[in-house]
Amino acid sequence: MTNEKVYSMPFGRVYACLIAKVERKGRTRAELDCATQWLTGYAPAEIRRCMEDGTTYGDFFRRAPGMNPNRSRIRGVVCGVRVEEIQEPLMREIRYLDKLADELAKGRPLEKILRSE
């Protein structure tokens, strides 16, 4: 799938899949919203609005109110690719959220996921 296809996908559809993934593993939407807020600066109500108003996945990240400066601490593999090695900045931001959702689903404590140290 090309980057442009990913960027043009409806945010609501993608985020619903992330919610389902974490809930299948016993985590909550509130925890995913918290991780998303940490990464992007969107409040939970704004995340819901973006899900409902047709915002694209690319625009969700392009318009993020405040990307967390500690996001570069997110490391690891998502879909066989190291997130820290992704060259295209927007795709790296998208994969950061994928990685946070993966860590939630794997049972990692939220405090560690948010890399507040």
Predicted regions and their residues:
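A charge-rich, low-complexity, intrinsically flexible signal that marks solvent-exposed coils, linkers
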Residues: M1-E117
